[in-house]
């Protein structure tokens, strides 16, 4: 169903492209051939990054991607990362954050994005814990994931793409490095 491809930097659509600001559609099943091709690209791109092969393919390394970043306006995300809790690998259709903590966090080095050429300085403030529901495209079953730390930030980042938002939209414009004492640094 999904094919391993050689990832290309030409696949990535940037934030200044009007496609990135159009409404994103829910995925309807069964998947189309186009859906399967885009998912193959998503898996190939992020897995090459995960396996340390970004330089080999001259791509910018990433831990997550949304279908819209490849020009496909459908709610599909793929995350593949390691953190203190181990390896995480999620390919989801129609992901939705259904619950979130009141506590907040930020990544101490800030965030980046495959679709943003010029990095924006500052801290993207995120919820510390999120519960995400969607269709697991590896099993074709609905799942609910409780995510914390880097995984929570990544889910929020990718779901933001489905709402035409970027990490820099979460940076305080007047004080980009503003934090409160009770916010957790990741």
UniProtKB/Swiss-Prot annotation:
Biological processes annotated in GO: co-translational protein modification; translation
EC supergroup of this enzyme: hydrolase
Active-site residues, Swiss-Prot/TrEMBL: 158
Coiled coil (residue ranges): none
Pfam entry (one): Pep_deformylase
DNA-binding keyword on record: no
GO molecular function terms attached to this record: metal ion binding; peptide deformylase activity
Homology family: Belongs to the polypeptide deformylase family.
NCBIfam families: pept_deformyl
Protein's name according to its UniProt entry: Peptide deformylase
Gene: def
